[in-house]
């Protein structure tokens, strides 16, 4: 099975690339809720509840999971000795997880279990670093380590100079001004 990640700074189209992959699956006849499922962290309500969304407004319905085991419990159930796919997800092939950086550290083990033991491919999108360029606190560093494929993207530089180069970091803005390293 496969664990695949889309990572990079904000505005590098991580979610957009994942939505395009979902559209390919749907075009191939896959059905959400049977062949694949989409998850987002419950705290990400920027574009409404129950969706993953690009900054341009492209959206896909999603299950809003409050933590890693909520995500696992949506597709699997404990049979007394191990997690098994729920009957309604017997044909599940793939899950998509947006904003993976917001989940708890258990996501690393949950994703590995879903991939290795349940035989389900996992696609994840999330920030790999903070505005300082340091690893984003949470599960992303561990998820990148266990991923079979890591796609790291750059955003378009939006500095006042509009340099046109690829941006490798997310710029934190405080009161309309770019934050310093210690802000």
What are the residue ranges of the model-derived segments?
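Short acidic/histidine-rich motifs immediately flanking catalytic phosphotransfer sites
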Residues: 89-94
């Amino acid at each position: 099975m496969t664990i695949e990640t889309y990572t990079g700074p904000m505005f590098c189209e991580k979610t957009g690339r994942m939505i395009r992959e979902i559209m390919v699956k749907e075009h191939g006849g896959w059905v959400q809720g049977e062949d694949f499922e989409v998850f987002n962290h419950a705290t990400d309500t920027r574009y409404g509840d129950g969706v993953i969304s690009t900054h341009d407004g492209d959206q896909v319905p999603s299950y809003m999971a409050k933590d890693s085991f909520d995500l696992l419990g949506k597709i699997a159930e404990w049979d007394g000795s191990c997690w098994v796919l729920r009957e309604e997800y017997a044909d599940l092939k793939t899950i998509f997880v947006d904003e993976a950086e917001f989940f708890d550290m258990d996501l690393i083990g949950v994703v590995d279990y879903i991939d290795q033991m349940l035989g389900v491919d996992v696609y994840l999108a999330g920030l790999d670093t903070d505005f300082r360029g340091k690893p984003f606190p949470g599960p992303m560093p561990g998820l990148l380590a266990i991923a079979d494929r890591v796609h790291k993207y750059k955003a378009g530089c939006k500095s006042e100079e509009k340099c046109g180069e690829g941006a490798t970091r997310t710029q934190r803005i405080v009161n309309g001004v770019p934050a310093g390293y210690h802000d």
